[in-house]
Regions:
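Membrane-proximal helix-turn-helix segments that form the acceptor-binding/catalytic region
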Residues: 125-147
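Carbohydrate-associated surface elements
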Residues: 152, 173
Length: 371
């Protein structure tokens, strides 16, 4: 088959995130299964307009703020006559509304909807644009099949009016050869908490920093390692300074996967206080490294955590509960190890091979369906 994927970024983009990892891990495997995959994505300074990355043909057009406006024009001018069997549209950030511009079969791939959370992340005008664009999804994509990464995302689409028959849940995977416990579990530190992810408002990393003040009143040696980049870093560093936490909180910036695994293997706990996620991929990565997680009880994170079995869920915005659970688990090693064992066992279920196989099954089903 020839498959066209439309996504905002490719894996080499400086701002590549979870959606790009999902695409790359899934579709490089689909290429190895004998299929041709073309990615249409946005440009960035220094990027070539065309190149091959791990067997995927990458075509770049438009820029960060213009890509969704460029896609329909570029598709009709350069790609409409190509013999693609299906288009996979990644509904990440702003939909491209490709069903309005082509009659080819479309698989809509959805990680999560921003909903009202987008108003915390950007200015009111752009937030309104994103919010209204998401409200149009049920009408524009009413004849499309959807692949979503969590049950929460599926349920949200159903509440918006789509049929459950249109939606397939396929969880993200992890590289189980890389994400695994250290050979010497006793080498784990006793009070190292780690956060990994983008430094964006909706991630609520400030809640975790404020919780650390309370944690250190009980556990003075507790430290926080923040892995990731984003536009909130300067504000978060200023918050650490105002809370006298500059010595206790370390910002790593971007790190390689290997370095991230090394930190997770040493960490006592991981914490994710987000407003919302598509799927808690970082939860599963931490679990695979034998690191229990405390996270907010919100879509995506509640799908990745079995509360009280593989991790702990707390109410959104409850910094006291966050601090309380971090303190409790730091002090209760048997409970921490119970959660770690359960989480590590469950993490083995989530592999990119399985994600790719199930995605390919959905694509083949759509392509083989009668017109």
């Amino acid at each position: 088959m020839r498959i066209l994927v439309v996504n905002w970024r490719d894996i080499h983009h400086p701002e590549a995130g979870g959606a790009e990892v999902h695409f790359h891990e899934t579709f490089t495997r689909i290429v190895k299964a004998g299929h041709h995959v073309t990615l249409l994505c946005s440009r960035y300074p220094g990027a070539e307009t065309r190149e091959w990355i791990d067997g995927i043909e990458v075509i770049r057009t438009g820029w960060k703020l213009t890509f969704n406006l460029t896609v329909p024009w570029f598709y009709h001018r350069h790609l409409a006559r190509e013999a693609f069997d299906i288009i996979v549209e990644d509904l990440n950030k702003i939909p491209f509304f490709l069903p309005c511009f082509t009659k080819r079969p479309i698989l809509a791939l959805l990680h999560h909807l921003f909903g009202t959370a987008v108003f915390r992340e950007t200015n009111p005008i752009f937030a309104s644009y994103v919010y209204l664009a998401e409200r149009l999804i049920p009408a524009v994509y009413r004849r499309c099949f959807f692949e979503v990464v969590s049950e929460s995302s599926r349920d949200e689409l159903i509440r918006m009016g789509l049929s459950s028959d249109q939606i397939t849940v396929i969880h993200n995977g992890i590289d189980t050869r890389l994400y695994k416990p250290t050979d010497v579990l006793d080498q784990k530190e006793t009070a190292l908490i780690v956060y990994m992810g983008r430094l964006k408002r909706y991630k609520n990393v400030d809640h975790l920093i404020l919780a650390m003040t309370a944690v250190r009143e009980v556990v003075p040696e507790a430290r926080l390692c923040i892995i990731g980049t984003g536009d909130q870093r300067e504000a978060l560093e200023a918050l650490c300074q105002s809370q006298n936490l500059t010595e206790a909180v370390h910002f790593t910036g971007f790190v390689s996967d290997l370095a991230k695994v090394g930190i997770l293997q040493q960490a006592t706990l991981a914490a994710f206080p987000s407003d919302k996620e598509g799927w808690g991929l970082t939860v599963i990565e931490a679990n695979a490294c034998y690191t229990p997680v405390v996270a907010t009880d919100v879509p995506g994170l509640r799908d990745a955590i079995i509360d009280g079995e593989t991790g702990i869920l707390i109410p959104l915005g409850d910094q006291k509960a966050l601090a309380r659970e971090l303190i409790r688990l730091i002090q209760d090693r048997p409970e921490r190890e119970r959660l770690a064992r359960n989480g590590a066992k469950r993490a083995t279920q989530f592999t990119w091979d399985t994600t790719a196989e199930k995605t390919l099954e959905v694509i083949e089903k759509i392509v083989m369906a009668p017109p």
